[in-house]
A protein has these predicted regions:
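NAD(P)-binding Rossmann-fold cofactor-contacting core
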Residues: 59, 66-83
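N-terminal hydrophobic or amphipathic helices and topogenic motifs
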Residues: 1-46, 67-70, 77
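Interdomain hinge/lid region at the active-site interface
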Residues: 231-305
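Hydrophobic/small residue at the entry helix of a nucleotide-binding pocket
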Residues: 56
Length: 317
């Protein structure tokens, strides 16, 4: 309706739609943030965020503070405004209701294992993008009798509105810890999904690993195109521009984190092998003039993507 009204007034329909979507998102963001704050789940309770100077650690600290938690950030990088601070979490008494491990993946397992030795009374969970590298630390916490689960917010630190976003919770056998972690996001509009540890990393190998690898290959091919590079900067197409927008965002992300996501996942090689096989098949079909294979690949992809969209539409009803 907005597009039709705009067109009747001589205004760009695309501009009108974009403006209306921005207004709706702004309104939903305000409503969601007000609901999170009003429920006050953290009133009279405390939380420790280990690695709270990192981007997602900072987001988590702010998210908990908005719910009324008294938040302490532990990070050797320096203090964070508006939060209590300790440089080293080991100096804390760990008498917190919630302990969040938001360190880089490569050191998170060691932190979890050390926490197991301290046996904190509160709920402990990490927010890492991968779970198989943390398996032993999580198991040590369980064996020590700690309340532990694992969480993966499927969005970046600049996210304000959680509507349409997913938060994954790993069921480690502690129903109380799982319920408490889910309750933290219960007042948001995020989709909350529970799954097993290995299932998570198998899926993440494709959801993150494959999409990252595809975009890294895309912008690497462009960057190494030689004299074509400056000419490409002056050309565009709908498909190229859309892919370039995604690749540009990927290129600005933390390369160390992206390498961890590729290299530390026990199931990561599956998606890379699948990508390599698909590219090799595509190349062979073109080089050998095999139109049937090329067409079959596109038809298979079209069918898969239509079925995926139908499943998403059904799930959102």
């Amino acid at each position: 309706q907005a597009r039709r009204d705009a067109e009747a007034l001589g205004v760009s329909p695309a501009l009108a739609e974009s403006l209306l979507q921005s207004l709706i998102r702004g309104s939903l963001t305000t409503q969601e943030q007000a609901r999170v704050a009003s429920q006050g789940r953290g009133s009279g309770r405390s939380a420790l965020v280990i690695g709270g100077r990192g981007k997602m650690g900072h987001w988590m600290a702010d998210f908990l503070a908005a719910q009324g938690f008294a938040v302490t950030v532990a990070d050797p990088s320096g203090e964070v405004a508006a939060d209590d601070y300790v440089a080293d979490w080991k100096s804390s008494d760990l008498h917190h209701d919630i302990i969040v491990v938001a360190t880089p993946i490569r050191i998170a397992n060691a932190v979890l294992a050390e926490l197991a030795g301290r046996r904190p009374r509160g709920i402990v969970f990490d927010i890492g993008s991968l779970k198989t590298p943390l398996r032993s630390g999580l198991e040590q916490l369980r064996a020590a009798g700690c309340h532990v689960t694992s969480v993966h917010p499927m969005f970046g630190p600049d996210t304000e509105l959680l509507s349409g976003r997913h938060v994954i919770f790993i069921d480690l056998g502690d129903a109380a810890a799982l319920a408490e972690a889910r309750a933290l996001f219960g007042s948001t509009m995020a989709d909350l999904v529970v799954m097993g540890l290995d299932e998570h990393d198998r899926l993440i190998a494709f959801v993150l690993g494959l999409s990252h690898a595809l975009n890294i290959a895309f912008f690497t091919a462009l960057a190494e195109s030689g004299e074509a590079a400056p000419r490409l900067a002056r050309m565009s197409s709908t498909t190229f521009d859309a892919q370039l927008d995604v690749a540009t965002r990927v290129a600005t992300e933390n390369p160390d984190l992206y390498f961890e996501i590729q290299s530390l996942n026990d199931y990561g090689v599956e998606s890379l092998n699948a990508l390599q096989a698909a590219v090799n098949r595509l190349c062979r079909s073109v080089q050998e003039g095999d139109a049937a294979t090329f067409v079959a690949m596109m038809q298979q992809g079209n069918e898969y993507l239509r079925e995926r969209q139908a499943a998403r539409d059904e799930a959102s009803r």
